[in-house]
Amino acid sequence: IWYTGIIEHASQTDYRRYNIRPDHPAIVKGKAGSPYAIKDYYDVDPDLATDVPGRMKEFENLVSRTHRAGLKVIIDFVPNHVARQYHSDAQPDGTTQLGANDDPNYSFSPYNNFYYIPQSELHGQFDMTGNALEPYHEFPAKATGNNRFDAYPNINDWYETVKLNYGVDYQNGGTCHFSPTPDTWTKMLDILLFWSSKNIDGFRCDM
């Protein structure tokens, strides 16, 4: 059985009382947000929980019940992009935030997790304020999830997401830089192993 939307994604629902960072409404599509704009690869979406602090245990119990019913579990894995304000507040010790060690002075580097538009602020061609008091700011701008490598995504782009960098330089003929192994590969392997440890049976990869 395919359980969609399990991993925590950007939302306009306020969960600050549970120490979950809020998302700027300008970069969330709709009130509930898109389940493909992941904001924390290591957490369960709190909208699905009966008991928000115990949401991971609830998911583990769901997996156990599914197996007892003779079914197997697959969940979505979204490797192409993440929410613009991605930040994991549940990642295990010994792991590093996506982008934490990036050098944003380079539009592309195989050592970066994101692609950047150096020295450029994001100038989205959509409402950059939403219902917030201040507009959303991003400097330097990151490339948008649907391969938009400029600072001007519009309403028809996946503007709520940023593209992940697996060592492919799209702006220079798609040249591949796979040796040494790009850092994003290692981080994604850690994420896949984390969810595999929850006894799921497979992933549906959404690109």
Where are the regions a protein language model picked out?
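Substrate-binding/active-site clefts of carbohydrate-active enzymes
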Residues: 5-194, 198
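Surface-exposed extracellular loop regions of Gram-negative outer-membrane beta-barrel proteins
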Residues: 193, 203-204
